[in-house]
From Swiss-Prot:
Transmembrane parts of this sequence: none
Cellular compartment(s): Nucleus; Cytoplasm; Cytoplasm, Cytoskeleton, Spindle
Region of interest (Disordered), residue spans: 1-35, 179-219, 446-510, 568-637
Interaction with NR1D1: annotated segments: 699-918
Chief localisation class: nucleus
One function term, GO molecular function aspect: RNA polymerase II complex binding
Region described as Interaction with MCC: 605-665
Modified residues (Omega-N-methylarginine): R180
An example Gene Ontology biological process: response to UV
Cellular-component GO terms for this entry: chromatin; cytoplasm; DBIRD complex; nucleus; spindle
Gene name for this UniProt entry: CCAR2
Protein name stated in the entry: Cell cycle and apoptosis regulator protein 2
Amino acid sequence: MSQFKRQRINPLPGGRNFSGTASTSLLGPPPGLLTPPVATELSQNARHLQGGEKQRVFTGIVTSLHDYFGVVDEEVFFQLSVVKGRLPQLGEKVLVKAAYNPGQAVPWNAVKVQTLSNQPLLKSPAPPLLHVAALGQKQGILGAQPQLIFQPHRIPPLFPQKPLSLFQTSHTLHLSHLNRFPARGPHGRLDQGQSDDYDSKKRKQRAGGEPWGAKKPRHDLPPYRVHLTPYTVDSPICDFLELQRRYRSLLVPSDFLSVHLSWLSAFPLSQPFSLHHPSRIQVSSEKEAAPDAGAEPIPADSDPAYSSKVLLLSSPGLEELYRCCMLFVDDMAEPRETPEHPLKQIKFLLGRKEEEAVLVGGEWSPSLDGLDPQADPQVLVRTAIRCAQAQTGIDLSGCTKWWRFAEFQYLQPGPPRRLQTVVVYLPDVWTIMPTLEEWEALCQQKAAEAAPPTQEAPGETEPTEQAPDALEQAADTSRQNAETPEATTQQETDTDLPEAPPPPLEPAVIARPGCVNLSLHGIVEDRRPKERISFEVMVLAELFLEMLQRDFGYRVYKMLLSLPEKVVSPPEPEKEEAAKEEEAIKEEVVKEPKDEAQNEGPATESEAPLKEDGLLPKPPSSGGEEEEKPRGEASEDLCEMALDPELLLLRDDGEEEFAGAKLEDSEVRSVASNQSEMEFSSLQDMPKELDPSAVLPLDCLLAFVFFDANWCGYLHRRDLERILLTLGIRLSAEQAKQLVSRVVTQNICQYRSLQYSRQEGLDGGLPEEVLFGNLDLLPPSGKSTKPGAAPTEHKALVSHNGSLINVGSLLQRAEQQDSGRLYLENRIHTLELKLEESHNRFSATEVTNKTLAAEMQELRARLAEAEETARTAERQKSQLQRLLQELRRRLTPLQLEIQRVVEKADSWVEKEEPAPSN
């Protein structure tokens, strides 16, 4: 809401000024900028929308509501005059049709807003709004009359379309080609719930007036979106108009002349830029001491005619990117957490200037760097090294390659007009990365420096001094404190929280605290970036993204060339005749049961059994069996549609438009069952016509993942064709269509279900004229015949110590050895992590074993005591038994004697009783 407050106080020069008289209110006149527009402005907005502005239709929640306007999802502004039907309440779910206009202060403005009717009544009443009475609602003594939410017949339709058009937002096929908009940035989102709401209404109306209940929770799939530019990425120069055409939301400075794309010659198609080497750059915290600067930041004789800047790349390396892609492919059965996209892992180290993220670099100094930067290319390299050392603390003098990435030209006004040139280099930062031994030594040094302040807890400092890195610290704490495996993990997390964060496990270059690391996704795709980004950073991020698009697209092109073509065998006439005869016989046999079923009544017709796969039985066709049909005709058989609750067959008969997304005739939606609950598993069940023996390299998987912005797992045919057409190798539309058909099934390429392995590229056996498309057929340009080919030199032989050395071959060999070394280092690092984990588990198991052994000794002692007690009790028992037997033996004669005495006493009593009577 801060942006709306700023809008009231200081309207931007590009903001829209609403005209017309404002309706008075009890609170006074409304804000002038937020006055409802008149009819003429609405018609102008409609003309703007027809002129190519971006639109999107989505469902959102009303997060803010005021007297004259509201906000949906804290980013889409809507006037209350565009609300159709009942006014929404705060927190309600609404259907929004919004338009994007970068010239306004608030770029996203709603054109239509409608409250959804399939949501429960809100507990809290709506806030009192002053415009309720003005909109025609009658008020009584107790206030406004309450309205029921569930009144769908009173709400006018927002998009009057046929019912079938609502089903095109399938969860299995998101056919919203959101990348067709030329402006860079978020391309909108498609409403995923409208078709399901319509579906559930129809089912419950047919079911006989069942109460409207809550829908079952289900897994919402991300919308389909690709990273793709709508133009060919081979233009060597971009002027002011070209930049505005490519990037409409970019603010170009007024003194800008042109930018030369030097990366086209530095990284041709035959030698693309490689992400194989990991180059991690980390910004140190404010507490750590910054490294000393090597030179003064601004020399006295600096000349703005030439400036040198560097693009410091921070990348995890190709192995880490492969690992994320393989995690995505391996989680097909049980999708868990979505891995991070490559665009979010590729980052750039930028400096700060007046709260703005800028490139690292500065102006040329003749006294420090050299005299002639135009003749000597090392002059600007020295400038870049000096400025990078002063601004970031990173010494780039150890970099072996300096690629000229782009060259900006500005016009300095004044009586002597001057041309200012800014050269941007891309150095190989991975060559100055510390080795594992150096990194471990640095971590030990930092651990030793951090140990003295933490002397209050001696039990915690001992493992810190002994451990060389964070893993050994965790192992020592687990040995000391853990008693069971579960307690081990809990105590490790508890003890790590109050301590200082451990150093990263992977080697990295440490930069000064004033710098910032921004990902490529955050610069290009983020609508509301946290950092203010300069013009040059935005352009370079777009150019770097276009370079990656060309390189990954070329990998897809080479992969398609290596795959065999699909052979479609036409049906034989003899088999067709035999199939016709069999079907005629079947029709005659089936006629009699059908007649009997019709006599029984219409109830039996609706009880026809379904097949085992859940599909209705198809009527017999005269074209032969289904297996013998070509795939092109198979899509035509999906034209049937049954609106049964257990079946939904969708088909597109022509181009329809919903939410700014066009559907093509060739794009047929897949089959879904289970009461129209579209699931992603139906995509995996599609037939795969790719040769099972064709195993693709991992770089093809990475290329597919790069274009798939939201990890949907598939790419559309149209997007694959456009990827090939934007490479700059001048392919025709028919060539692209034939190549794409090798991996496409039903207009979709399910790259997630293909087979991949760690092997080299597939362009080894392909001829050169095929690799460069149709460039050899076109007339040569002014500079070179093949722009994609590497510039040819006279000879790569250099005389050294009396012998000729092939420098190109040596460089290639060194590159191969470096790649092998990196792979082995990654494997060793992985094994070290596994070994350390096993060591931690072993230590925890040792502690558990010791605890169990102590418990066992205690139990043994208690068992011995119990046995001794049992023996004592047994002895006492036997003794008592003997005493009882002896007492019994002695008491028996005494008992007999007492019995005799009693009998005698009784006899005497009987004798004495009759005497007194005489």
